[in-house]
Swiss-Prot record:
This is Large ribosomal subunit protein uL2. Keywords: Ribonucleoprotein, Ribosomal protein, RNA-binding, rRNA-binding. One of its GO terms (molecular function) is rRNA binding. Part of the 50S ribosomal subunit. Forms a bridge to the 30S subunit in the 70S ribosome. One of the primary rRNA binding proteins. Required for association of the 30S and 50S subunits to form the 70S ribosome, for tRNA binding and peptide bond formation. It has been suggested to have peptidyltransferase activity; this is somewhat controversial. Makes several contacts with the 16S rRNA in the 70S ribosome. The lineage of its organism: Bacteria, Pseudomonadati, Chlorobiota, Chlorobiia, Chlorobiales. GO terms for biological process: cytoplasmic translation. GO terms for cellular component: large ribosomal subunit. Transmembrane segments: none annotated. It comes from the Bacteria. Residues 34-55, 221-279 are annotated as: Disordered. It holds the Pfam family Ribosomal_L2. Disulfide bonds: none annotated. Residues 232-242 have a biased composition (Gly residues). The gene is rplB.
């Protein structure tokens, strides 16, 4: 992926950059793989805001992605690489030999015309999906299952990959993009390679309006609010003393920096060898 940077013709374009979409080969999606996507505006079914700073944005259709890769031993040809407005990675349209069409996450290096397979005993090739027990140590993988047959849940965003570090007994040890080292059952599936579009993190939106196109609303600092609205509000100027403003907090009074919120009794904790914040 290549990024184009604009010159300072206007204040907005001074730092603005965007993808050239060179890897995208098709501009219109496959209609049979689209589903309606209703906007929530960050509200739950009671109409209350549960996720702040969401709302508006361009209308989208959801692209139905095959995270399970369950069509075993049937070759699939890559027909197109497409843009997906619902995720940071690109998606690939597969045409299976039996006539079915499916979308998958597009790995780095995948090209139109490539033939992909999924199953227990398939070649170690970018885009092929198989159980972790059949993947060699040191391989980079993405779209990793946490529960067999549920579909990939980890390493799915642009540029993400996990490294298979060890296999011992019924579990494989993976180093995840966050730095966490975690055990997963060796029957769980993963796809060879890393996700493409790895320059996504270098894109600068450049102006407020571009955030609004993406459905992101403005954020107001707690320190700029009144005490009735936020624990860090009030005071003369940028005051950090008194009224609970000494330590950064969320709008609901919870410490905002460094407080661990994960349930210590969670069953999957025993599978985490090293946390993502461990030094």
């Amino acid at each position: 992926m290549a990024i184009r940077k604009l010159g300072p013709v206007t204040p907005a374009s001074r730092y603005l950059s965007y993808s050239k979409f060179e890897e995208v080969t098709k501009s219109t999606p496959e209609k049979s793989l689209l589903a309606p996507l209703k906007k929530s505006g960050g509200r739950n079914r009671a109409g209350r805001i549960t996720s702040r700073h969401k709302g508006g944005g361009h209308k989208r259709f959801y692209r139905i992605i095959d995270f399970k890769r369950s069509k075993d031993n049937i070759p699939a040809k890559v027909a197109a690489i497409e843009y997906d407005p619902n995720r940071s990675s690109r998606i690939a349209l597969l045409h299976y030999a039996d006539g079915e069409k499916r979308y998958i996450l597009a790995p780095k290096g995948l090209k139109v015309g490539d033939v992909l397979h999924s199953g227990d005993k398939v070649d170690i090739k970018v885009g092929n999906s198989m159980p972790l027990k059949n993947i060699p140590l040191g391989a980079d993988v993405h779209n990793i299952e946490l529960k067999q047959g549920k579909g990939g849940q980890m390493a799915r965003s642009a540029g993400a990959f996990a490294t298979l570090a060890a296999k011992e007994g019924d579990h494989a040890t993976l180093k995840l993009p966050s730095g966490e080292i975690r055990k997963v059952r060796i029957e769980c599936r993963a796809t060879i390679g890393g996700i493409g579009n790895d320059d996504h993190e270098n894109i600068v939106l450049g102006k407020a309006g571009r955030s609004r196109w993406l459905g992101i609303r403005p954020q107001t600092r707690g320190m700029a609010m009144n005490p009735v609205d936020h624990p860090m509000g009030g005071g003369e100027g940028r005051s950090k003393s008194g009224g609970g403003r000494k330590h950064p907090k969320s709008p609901w009074g919870q410490l905002a920096k460094g407080l661990k919120t994960r349930n210590k009794k969670k069953a999957s904790s025993k599978l985490i060898v090293r946390g993502r914040k461990a030094k």
